Amino acid sequence: MELRHLRYFVAVGDALNFGRAALALHIAQPPLSRAIRALEAELGATLFDRGTRGVRLTGAGAALLPEARRLLRDAEAFREGARQYAAGAAGTLSIGFVS
C-alpha cells in the first residue's frame, strides 16, 4: 500500500467527486480512478459507490477514512521527525537552573 493511494482516498472521500479530487491533487482523473481501484483491490473492499448520482462512501469507506487520515498524519509526523533528526534539531534538551 502506498501513502499516495491513501492521500487519493482521503481526497475523494472529502470531495465525494473524482474530478474535484483530481483537481485538488493536481493529477488527471483517470490515474486517480485507477489508483482508487488498485487500493480497493489490495484491501479487498469497495470504498466508494459510483453511480450516475455521484460518489458515496460505502460502509467500509466510511469506516476506513478516519484511519487513512490518521495514517497520513502519522506518516507526516515521522517524516518531520526524520528531517529534524537529520538536521541535528532532534534530541533531548535538559535545562536546569540554580536559585
Which residue ranges define each predicted feature?
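Enrichment for repetitive, rod-forming helical segments
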Residues: 11-14, 41, 46, 86
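N-terminal short secondary-structure element
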Residues: 1-35, 51, 55, 64
